[in-house]
């Protein structure tokens, strides 16, 4: 048997793919795949929905903004400045029209940002402003999104998808329990606010916890039952026979 070999010459050339690795995805628009390069990203914390009163002849103000220890915020703006190097004016014009066409008609949808692996935002595109620099052959777009103030985790608590784990802010905890007798379980919400929790059930299980006396859940009614999962550690008592899964998604002020 005879083999033929191809000579591999040594080289010191560094090869790079001229494809952006940072960007955002909204609707069917992926800034990386189109070829837009992110220059800057701005996501300041949102303004609080304040209720304050000033009383004559008293110092300071009375702040009634909080309820049950929780602060409430308005939407937040997330702004991207992205650039597209193109020497031909006609091509720059095409990309300007296309980014507006792709982003502005879309209603409230998920905004995925490579800067925040493990999270997504929910909102809509507020504006797209474009600057065309003929001298530099550079198209610059400033894209503003109007979003819910908190970011959502990509997956439900307990899914622990390895690629979405944020090790600096994460706990590993079971959320599904096999119930054969009365048992106490503890779940922790390490997010930034209380969140709604749903259930998935087999058999018949009764759950009691903070803020409610008890729900008797079956496969037929579990999808209609919800509770609020407060911040911190929460103790629940489960009884009956079957399995019960707590299904909630953290919301983070990041």
Region spans (language model):
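Solvent-exposed loop and beta-edge segments used for protein-protein assembly and interaction
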Residues: 72-76, 103-105, 135-139, 191-193, ...
């Amino acid at each position: 048997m005879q083999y033929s070999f191809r000579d591999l010459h040594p080289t010191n050339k560094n090869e790079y793919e001229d494809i952006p690795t940072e960007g955002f995805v909204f609707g069917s628009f992926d800034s990386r795949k189109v070829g837009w390069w992110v220059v800057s990203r701005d996501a300041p914390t949102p303004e609080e929905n304040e209720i304050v009163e000033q009383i004559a002849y008293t110092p300071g103000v009375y702040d009634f903004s909080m309820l049950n220890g929780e602060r409430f915020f308005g939407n937040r703006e997330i702004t991207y400045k992205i650039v597209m190097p193109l020497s031909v004016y006609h091509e720059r014009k095409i990309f300007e029209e296309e980014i507006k066409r792709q982003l502005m008609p879309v209603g409230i949808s998920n905004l995925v940002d490579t800067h925040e692996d493990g999270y997504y935002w929910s909102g809509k595109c507020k504006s797209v402003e474009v600057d065309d620099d003929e001298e530099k052959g550079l198209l610059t777009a400033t894209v503003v999104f109007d979003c819910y103030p908190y970011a959502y985790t990509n997956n439900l608590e307990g899914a622990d998808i390895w690629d979405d784990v944020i090790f600096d802010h994460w706990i590993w905890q079971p959320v599904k329990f096999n119930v054969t007798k009365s048992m106490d379980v503890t779940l922790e919400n390490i997010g930034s606010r209380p969140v709604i929790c749903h259930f998935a059930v087999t058999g018949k299980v009764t759950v009691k916890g903070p803020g409610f006396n008890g729900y008797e859940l079956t496969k037929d009614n579990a999808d209609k039952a919800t509770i609020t999962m407060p911040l911190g550690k929460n103790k629940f008592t489960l009884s009956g026979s079957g399995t019960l899964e707590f299904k909630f998604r953290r919301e983070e002020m990041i």
